Amino acid sequence: MNTMTTYSGRKFDPMQMTPGDVYIEDIAHALSLLCRGGGQLTYFYSVGQHSLNCAAEAKARGWSKRQQLACLLHDASEGYISDIIRPVKIYLTNYLAVSYTHLRAHETLANL
């Protein structure tokens, strides 16, 4: 078992996770510190802020609460497995599979 210790102090195995292993405070903390675009921006723009902006845009467009929540959580897996820039990510099928598993767990928790 390969685990990491999360912000909240819990042991987390990103390859064997279940919805019960996911804690929103761990996701929020990690995403607030993770810069979009591999850090190749002229200013710090966190994945967390991006997620909040996506949810706010969904609300401004009159989308349902469920759609707003989906927008908020669309990058939640990156809170545990970090981010890889899209030009590389598309070639990493194992990463995509793990990311999808995390996304499904987050959707389950949010009843999406």
What positions do the PLM features span?
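Alpha-helical phosphate/pyrophosphate-handling elements in metalloenzyme active cores
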Residues: 40-66
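Alpha-helical scaffolds flanking conserved acidic
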Residues: 24-27, 62-76
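N- or domain-start disorder-to-order transition segments that initiate the globular core
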Residues: 7-22
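Active-site-flanking alpha-helical
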Residues: 77, 81-82
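Conserved alpha-helical "signature site"
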Residues: 1-4, 36
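Conserved small/polar residues in nucleotide/adenosyl-binding loops
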Residues: 101-110
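Active-site flanking loop/helix segments enriched in acidic
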Residues: 28-46
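Post-HEXXH active-site segment of zinc metalloproteases
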Residues: 84-96
